[in-house]
Amino acid sequence: AIYFKGDWLNQFEKESTKDKEFFSTTDNVVEVDMMAMFGESFNYGEADGVQILEMPYVGNDLSMLVILPKQGQMDKLEEDMTIENLMKWNSKLKKEKVNLFLPKFKFEIKTMLTKTLQEMGMPTAFSGNADFSGMDGIKSLQIDQVIHQAFVAVDEKGTEAAAATAVVMIESMAPLEPEEPKLFNADHPFIFMIQ
């Protein structure tokens, strides 16, 4: 099991969280607690019709990367999610002042992996022919089920996640130029990852 709890380097003010519309589809709107932050510096970039924002955690070893497609373009983003594109999008990041709107969210997922693992070449482990004698001294054990659970909660203070994978990145600094802050308004579906 993996557990992660990280506080944002730049935390949201609770007073700035307001009820706002979130367009889960172009036809479906729900009210969410939308966090807001104005004029803060983040690694930010735009490429291939998506906005990319890196939100560092205290210590700067880990961050949340938020990838926001244009509204109604989530299917295209899912198709475009390749390691090559992620590397390209990461290379476009530079320090920018950003007006950020991000919903508070929490989700939990439970997935049964038994069938998947059997199809990947592990059928014997789930049968009476399994040999786990190294665990019990006799051949009396077999796998019944494999369940994967993941939990993520994002709020003003930071992120709490279980079963998350982390990749340590080095933050590069770019000089700041005084200009209008970029708008990153996550009021529709987006993809995030902890890296």
Regions found by a protein language model. Name each.
Residues A1-Q195:
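Secretory/exported precursors with cleavable N-terminal leaders
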